[in-house]
Structure formats: structure tokens, C-alpha cells
Amino acid sequence: MGSGSQSLRKKLLLAVAAPIVFFIAIEGSLRLFSYGNPSTFTLRKTYSGQDYHVANPNFTARFFPKQNPRSPVPFAIPVKKPANGLRVLVLGASAAQGDPKPSFGFSRMLERMLSGQFPERSVEVFNLGITAINSHVVKDIASDCRKLEADYWVVYLGNNEVIGPFGPANPSQSTRGNLLKIRNSLLQSRTGQLLTDLLSVNKKQPLQWKGMEDYLQPIQWDSPELMKVHADFRANLESIVKSGKKSGTEVLLSTVAVNLRTCSPLLPEGPAQNSWKARDFAKARDLDAYRFRADSRTNEIIREVASNDGLRLIDSARRFAMLEPEASEPLFLDHVHFTLAGNSLIASLIVENILDQQERNPRPPSKNPTLGFTRFDRHGVLKIMQGRLSRAPFLKQSTNGLSAKRLQPMIERLAPNSTEVLEAIDQKYLEAIEAHPQDPFIRNNYITFLLYHNLTVEARPHCQKALELAPWDPKTHYHMGLVLAGSQNPTNACRHLQDAIVIEPGHHLSHSLLGSLLMDGDPESALEHLYAALRIEPDDVRTLLALANLRLAANKLDLRDHKEAYSLALQACAKTKFTNPNALVLFAEATKHSNRRKETRAKLEDAIRATEDPKTKAMLQETLENL
């Protein structure tokens, strides 16, 4: 009896131990041969002899399709914290990141403001926000941030709970939540990554990510799905707070301010629209079944968690609601993202909280707080927002909601239209650089301005300086690649673009430019990079045209595809409303090769009728006559 029982125990032990030993052996072998990628949020890198924590470019592969990675604003956190350092980490999604221009987000303003309030400290504010993530992702980020020796975590989170990873409105994940969580856990190991790669199908098939259009799944206010979302959010937020406390960090939770007054329901049907008409804006937001904004219950949970854990609360939602009606300028660009004034308000609320916690009286504002925000930057922000507001989910809003058309007069007014205006913008950038010479963000914005106006010679020394200041930023390598692409040194241009892609695999501009540079010498690689760029940013006209050109006239016949070239050229024309001469030339050429003159004539005739601009009309008419 005893020996039989002992034998059974041995068999059970072997049954349990064998797979574990096998897994450890496989995992060890894969790591030994450098298969797969680390799953942590940060990696350790050395630049100029100093060790830093930098973003892991593969971190979000557990939460998003591999072809559409998400990345934070590039950062490099010194492993050795300054003795007099005041280190702040900002955690959250796109609103926390400062989208659409993180260089003017509240993290940047917070750093300037804190530097003015604590002149005796070495102030560091690191923006760890990532577009499209939610608390399921931030929970893992927070766990990894425990080693970063921060004094404060600012957690601004809650807009993407329904649409982000594991959310019920996420089309790729909502019906498979538990399976995806298991997959997510497996992907933290190299063995799990190997299994995923082996089981993946159509890995090279282009994926068209459309942004917010992908998440138009109505979720009702009283639905079981939303109740689960709120329960998950509470659990994740408590986990984030626990990670912060374990690291000895002061965690500052903020409620989430959203646009209530000028963002009508995104799905304007039934009770939501009735509440909007009755000017009960908060209720209209809660009843809006397209859940792209944090609702009132989400903010209640944030307040409750802060209270239960004895944390200091930044009640941004209430402060915005109080101040917005009297604000001298808009606080929101769209449904949740801030204007410069909105970002400034959030930053000031955080500073107010930190000063209160440290029992310090506020000092007068710094004399040089500038971030170098110019007319050129404002124009660029409005152009981005016009593009976004022209697409779902904003298309169904009532006429008094957000509107792309309303931005057009401002965009036209801000467009640099004279030498004097350009010189004034240039001077403002140079003054900002002089005030903050070690700031890579200002310098990169200035480089963007110079390259936009084809001033590559003037841009090159600033590109070199930006590379010295922030070699971990893919934008610095992309800018240098762009400058060198127009010179006699395409090899070095390609090297910088490849460096940018290593740092951030989702840097679509580098993929697009590299694809264009490789079209003659290595068309197969060119095709791969152009498809990668298009998967990440399907509306990029330059990529559409480059890919159409390659498919139309590749020096290898097997890479030619006239049907696809026609489709790509047509997309480029449609995106530019048939006003881009290069797109029209390529469209006409693709028409001839694909024998689709009748279809093209109809498209051009429609465009002629739609435009009121005489020059555009003449250009379209000439294209039509030359078919």
C-alpha cells in the first residue's frame, strides 16, 4: 500500500515537473540564441557612456497587432538618478501623451513649471503615455516603472477602457477576451512568442488600421459589458497604485476631463441626443454609445480609489467643468485631446497638487518657460485635427458638434503666406533654442519647419545637434535621413532610416522614405517598407504614390501590378480631393496601363463638378483630355 502510494506520488511529480523542465529548457535555448524580444516596458541602453532606461519597441506587441505597434514619446531615463533630482512619470494614453503634438503636451509644460518652482532641484518629467492603450496596458507599465526611482507618478487614464485592449468595442478582441489575456501572458515568454509566430497566418498581408473608425461598436450605458469594463478599470487602477506604493512613489491620480460642451454625442440617437438638446452635457456623454470618452462612473472610480488608498486627487474633470464656460480660448481640440490652453491647465493643476503636498508656496512663473510653439505648429495641429474630424466617429454628430469645416478659415489664416511671416516664425524658434539649447523637442520642431520649406542646408547642423541630444529618438534619425536623401549620400540616408526603424518599428515616415530610396536598387525591400508604412498610416499620400509608382514601373516584372497601382493612385487622388498634380499624373498613367479609361473619366468629371477652384478645374480638365 505504502509503496504503491509512493509510486503514484512519483508519477504525479514527474507529470508536473516534466513540462516545467521542458519549458525552462526551451525558454533558455531561445534566449541563448536571441530568439524573440523582451516583454518589459523599458530596456537598458548606453549612450555616450551613460546608462539609460529607454522604451522597448516591442512592448505593445502583446496588446496590438504586430504590424501596428504603439510607442510612447521617445525617452531616456538615466539609471543613476541625480542626487538632487525630482523625477516625475506621466502614465496614460493619448491625452496624457499630448496627442496630436506631444512636444506641447502637459508633460512638457509640467517640466517647465516644476523647474520654475524647484530651481534647486534637477527636474525630470518623463512622458510614458501611449496612444490607444488603457488600464490593462498601464497596469503592466506601472509594474515595470517600479525600478525607475520616481518621486511622483501622475496617472491620467480612462478614455480608452471600452475601445482599448480587452475592451468590448475592440473588434479584434471583444469576443475573445479571456483567450487574449492568456495569449498576452504567453507572449511575455520567448516560447510563447515562438508559438505565436508558428501559428500566425498571412503575416505579410497588409493590415489597414483606420484609427477610431475601427471601434464603432455601440455599448449601452446600462449594459453588462460596461459594468465589466468599470470593474476591470477599478482592479487595474488599484494594481497601478499598489505598484507605485511598493516603489515608494507618491501616486497622483487625476480624474479625466473630456469635452462636454462642444462635442455632441458621437452616436446621436435616442436618449443621448435628447440630453444634449436639453443641455445636460454630462448625461449626454454617459448615454453616448460610442464610448471614446471617459464617463462619469470612470471618474467616480478614480475618486473612490484615491480616497480608499489615501492618495492626493487631481480632480481635473471638475476643474475643467468649472473653468471651461469662462475660458478665454477653447480647452479641447476634439472629444478628449487638449489645446495648448488645456494642456497648460492640466499641468498647473498637477503643480498645484505637488506644491501643496510639499507645503511650498508658489514662486513667480519662470522667465523662459517657452516650448517654442509657433504659428507653424498651430497650423500643423489644426491640419491634423481637420483630417481626424473628417472621419468617423465624428461624421454623425449634430451640426453644433465638432466640425472639420469650421477649422478651414483658421487654417487658411495661419498658413505662412509671406517672407515676413516665415522670418518671424524662424526667429521664434531660434529664440526658444537659445533659451533651452539642450531641448531636443524644440530643435526637432524647428527642423520640421526648415525641411517643410526645403531648407535642407540650414537644417543639417540642427539635425546633427538633435542626434547628439537624443540618439534614442527615431525622429532625429529620420530627419538626418531626409536631409541626406536629397544629397549625394543615399547610403548614409538609408542607415539613419534603418536606425529609426530599429528604435521604433512603427515609424511610418522612415519606412516610407526608405522604401522610396530602395525602389531602384532593392525593389523587394522597398515593397516591404512601403507596405509597412501603409499599414501604420493608410492615408499617407506620399506612401500611396510611391507604392503606386513601384507597382506601375518596377524594374522587375513580377513586382508590377497595374490593378493595384490604379487603386493606390485613385486613393491618393481621393485623399487630396483631386488637387495633387503628382497624384493625377500617376492616376492617368495607371489608367492607361490598366485600361480603365471609362471609370477614370467618370471620376475626373465628378471632381470637376465638385471643385470651385479654377486652377484645379483646369488641371482636371487637361488630365481628362489627355487620357
What do these predicted ranges mean?
Residues 36-118, 323:
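Membrane/wall-proximal cationic-aromatic binding patches
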Residues 104, 158-304, 308, 316-329, ...:
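Serine-dependent acyl-ester chemistry module
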Residues 440-441, 474-475, 508-509, 541-542, ...:
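Helix-start (N-cap) detector for alpha-helical repeat units in TPR-like alpha-solenoids
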Residues 286, 433-434, 467-468, 498-502, ...:
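Conserved structural position within tetratricopeptide repeats
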Residues 14, 228-233, 331-362:
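Histidine-centered active-site loop/cap adjacent to the catalytic His
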Residues 150, 289, 437, 471, ...:
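Short coil turns that delineate tetratricopeptide repeat
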